[in-house]
Amino acid sequence: MVLNSTPPASPGAEAQQRPPRYPGEDTAPTSRKEIWGWYAYGIAAEVFAVCGVGSFLPLTLEQLARERGTLLSSHLPCVGSSSPSTAPGNGTTTATLRRDGTDNDQCVVSVLGLQVNTASFAMYTFSLAVLVQALTLISFSALADYENNRKTLLLAFGFIGSMTSMLFIFIAPPVYILGSLLVVIGVTCLGSSFVVLNSFLPVLVANDPSIQTAHKEEGEELSPVNSSGEFARSEDLDEENVRDSDDHFTTGHGLKTKAAGSASPELQLSTRISSKGVGLGYCAAVLVQILSILMLFALSKTSLPKISGTLPMRFVLLLVGIWWFSFTMVSRRWLRDRPGPPLASSKGAASNSRWRIWLRLIGFAWKSLWKTVKVAVKLREVIVFLIAWFLLSDAMATVSGTAILFARTELKMSTTAVGLLSITATLSGMAGAFLWPVVSRRLRLKSNHTIMLCIALFEVIPLYGMLAYIPLFKKWGVIGLQQPWEIFPLGIVHGLVSGGLSSYCRSFFGLLIPPGSEAAFYALYAATDKGSSFIGPAIVGMLIDATGQVRSGFFFIAVLILLPIPLIWMVNAEKGRQDGLAMADILEKSHGEHASEYGGPSEEAEGLLARDI
């Protein structure tokens, strides 16, 4: 197996290396350059997440379909000289759209023989993309932990995803369906690459010289998991049998850290690196979003919008793709391979043996997730919270997609204005991550009470949009998201609430997990998140098709946001913690009963999905 040839961080670094736990493991001390290689991918991909998925991809998809669509009643083109009216907007041309709901004519496009509203087309596309992403994450979670697959998959997802963004420059309205396919591939690559990227973090931390020094000072041995230097696979979970670790759980990299509750050096370093990575990613996204707005403004002064209303946005997606590709190249150069254990195969086996092993790993990933579900069902507080998280994560994803399309179609906002809205929400989200701990501390709120407060504020968004159905406000032409400026305060609310919900839900769930089973249960947490987020957009898309208005989706969203509140209130954190500890005792008793099937590390066998947190 060929290892990365990056030199050690210092001349004496080799002396600080911990013993390898399997043939071919790279235990070279983590260098500053390698950490920046890890940061570089976050800087690369977060731009696509915010500027692409969160802003311009929904707009581009809707506009591509619109330029190919016809009005439902007259069958006239939605866009063009023969359409009843047009409204320019910084490089795009928009057909007749309602702001007050009085015009029931809608722009539809034929998809698989069905007449679909152009806004619904975008919602359905993202719903499908999230579903494919969830299936991909679960299926490839185990495979990525072996040999050089970790870095190989990271680069593959990064390069393929960036190419999908760049290829939008060639997607003209006649082939708008191909744009939908590119979105599915791009979103899948984005989510999958972040999961693989997160899997590098424990490896970087475990090999950091400061961690090894700290363990030596504490007299802790940097030893393999077992005496043979092999890893134990995660245990099979059944009605009586649940995996657990000892009082110290293994990080999956040969280091033993204290159980949850103590601030280990690994946890402190991991948190510090992760926080900086998130911050750098968001800063890069805001920077590129500003550049995109300037580009749209400049291109609106040219003849490009006359050729196609989507061309300026497609140039923005080209910029986003180039950015993603370029910084992925930096990660390719600076990140070491850090290979996992070799795939077990029989001597002299045919080449197709490797494919059989890969298929077994994919099956194992699904089997492992299902067994974790069966264990979670026995923990009442865990299952109640996961149901609430299922609904809440779906609501968050649905609001984001609906808001962008509502701003574009119902409010007739220009592409530049939508970009500014995205920047507003992103900056507010960064502020919310810091603000909510202060609010919680000042008001002396429990974690679940803070989550409920966030949800209550989140409910303001759809309720405010529904005010436009009240005749008095409808007559005024203001209040209830009837004017473009009204959506910006709600964008601030959305950002602040999303920042709080993401951090508090994750930490609150951590209180309920049996100590030592963090990887398996966070895999279930991530699968619940990814697996639910395709439902809401699909339902909103159907409502848009039925009514011809994006605003009608607010009724469903309002109910969806409210449903988790009683469930969160029902969760007893202290009881959940005690149940988790009791389950941990069962885990400890069953630890080591089953032999390793693949020869992979215990945590890594849980799958990379556990690290998408």
From Swiss-Prot:
Q: Where in the cell is it found?
A: Vacuole membrane
Q: Which UniProt keywords apply?
A: Amino-acid transport, Autophagy, Glycoprotein, Membrane, Transmembrane, Transmembrane helix, Transport, Vacuole
Biased composition range(s): Basic and acidic residues: 232-250
Q: Which SUPFAM superfamilies match?
A: MFS general substrate transporter
Region annotation Disordered: residue ranges?
1-28, 80-99, 216-257, 592-613
Mostly located where?
membrane
Glycosylated positions are N90, N226, N448
**Its family?**
Belongs to the ATG22 family.
Role this protein plays? Vacuolar effluxer which mediate the efflux of amino acids resulting from autophagic degradation. The release of autophagic amino acids allows the maintenance of protein synthesis and viability during nitrogen starvation.
The molecule here is called Autophagy-related protein 22-2
Origin organism is Neosartorya fischeri (strain ATCC 1020 / DSM 3700 / CBS 544.65 / FGSC A1164 / JCM 1740 / NRRL 181 / WB 181) (Aspergillus fischerianus)
